Structures are given as structure tokens and as C-alpha cells.
Amino acid sequence: MLEQVCQLARNAGDAIMQVYDGAKPMEYARKQDDSPVTAADIAAHTVILEGLRTLTPDIPVLSEEDPPAWEVRQHWQRYWLVDPLDGTKEFIKRNGEFTVNIALIEQGKPVLGVVYAPVLKVMYYAAEGKAWKEECGVRKQIQVRDARPPLVVISRSHTDDELTEYLQQLGEHQTTSIGSSLKFCLVAEGQAQLYPRFGPTSVWDTAAGHAIAVAAGAHVHDWQGKTLDYTPRESFLNPGFRVTIY
């Protein structure tokens, strides 16, 4: 099933690129929570939703662009969790740092994850405790790697006082910034050692990257030390968290 989901992510990426390259209008707007949405978000959502319903008709889908009501999903034990275009701000800025995120959740845990960056033509994916990176048709297994001083990856679009204070207290380190779920993937492939997050995220922002990071040997915990949990709850918001190899 993993390969079929990877192909779905590629197809969604193709739909996004039609808008990104100007073949279709962007039609940029704002949602109720003031987050941006484009025609590319909707196009990718449609591709993934139709594909997953064909691939696994018995597994429900929670997508950022059409989340079912709480009453519908409150008893879900197994479901797909999708962000058709993670990093819409990066898409609008045209810096290429946006991704397609698809995760399979079982009993609150992300057991399969796919993150595809269509501009960069890089795919990360994980299942059954193993993680891979595919680039230019070449696939390699990835795992975390220690480095001193550690490289800390932070959000390109979201900074806050809590993060600034945390970094000041961290000790010797280097920082880099990148958009979307690629932060999880940098830790997973050994390029970075820590991704701290204080600002708001939603479950669809993190689940696929979470699966990949954990399969590569990282830990994804909230600031109380608990593993991020995707058991259905009324709010889609995550607590603050960190992705770390330590």
C-alpha cells in the first residue's frame, strides 16, 4: 500500500504544480481561521481523497480542506490524516518549501507517512519502522545522525518569543529554517538534530512527518514528554512539541 500512497502524493503534487507553474489560476483566499487557501490546496485534496477512497474504501479520511464533524470521527480507530498542501504560505511565496502530507493513523499513532515536495522532487516515506528518501529516482534508507554542535531547524514562517528564549538557553548550536513538514524530514535524514515547536500546528501538519521521523530513530514529544497523539479529539490543534534525536 505504501507505493500506491506515494503515487497518490506524486499525483497531488502534479495538480499543485499546474497552479504553481501558472497553467491554472491560483485563486488565493482566506479561511475562517485566517489561514490561506489556494486552488492548489483544493486540487490536491480532490486527487488524494478520490485516490484513498478507491485504495481503501473502508478507511475514512480526515483532510484539512474538508474535515468531518466531530460526531462523525469521534470513534475512528483507523483513518487517513491528510494535508494536501502543507506550507501554503511557502507556496504563495514561491520558495518551493511546501509538501503533500499523507499519514495513516492506527490507535492514535501514525504508522505510515508520506511527505512529497513537488518543486524539489523529493519524497520521504515511512512504514513498518523504516524510513526512506527518494530523489531523482534513487531511493535510500534514512536515519538520524548526531552532530556537535547540533543543527536546530526552525520554521521559516512562524517565530515567537518562546522559541527565541528556548534557543538562548540551549547552549552551543546552529540554526537553519525551512517550511512545512520538511523540518521533520531534515531530522529524519540526519541533516538536523532538533526541531522545537512552540507556535500552533494542527494534526494534519505533523502526522506524516511524525511517522517518518520516528521510523528514522527520532522522538516526537510534547513539552511534558508525552508522544504526540492522534486519537480523534474535537480540536485539531497540537500542543507544542519537539522532534529530537536525543
From Swiss-Prot:
One Pfam family here: Inositol_P
Binding-site residues for substrate, renumbered to this chain: 64, 85-88, 205
Reactions listed under catalytic activity: adenosine 3',5'-bisphosphate + H2O = AMP + phosphate
Example GO BP: 3'-phosphoadenosine 5'-phosphosulfate metabolic process
Inducers of expression: Strongly repressed during nitrogen excess.
Positions with a binding annotation for Mg(2+) 1: 64, 83, 85
Keywords of the record: Cell inner membrane, Cell membrane, Hydrolase, Magnesium, Membrane, Metal-binding
Record's bilayer topology term: Peripheral membrane protein
InterPro entries associated with the record: CysQ, CysQ/Inositol_MonoPase, Inositol_monoP_metal-BS, Inositol_monophosphatase-like, Inositol_monophosphatase_CS
Domain of life (superkingdom): Bacteria
EC identifiers of the protein: 3.1.3.7
GO MF term set: 3'(2'),5'-bisphosphate nucleotidase activity; magnesium ion binding
Cellular component per GO, a single term: plasma membrane
EC top class, as a word: hydrolase
Needed cofactors: Mg(2+)
Compartments, record wording: Cell inner membrane
Sequence positions that bind Mg(2+) 2: 83, 86, 205
Family of the protein in this entry: Belongs to the inositol monophosphatase superfamily. CysQ family.
Protein's job: Converts adenosine-3',5'-bisphosphate (PAP) to AMP.
HAMAP family xrefs: CysQ
This protein's name: 3'(2'),5'-bisphosphate nucleotidase CysQ
Organism: Salmonella typhimurium (strain LT2 / SGSC1412 / ATCC 700720)
Protein's gene: cysQ
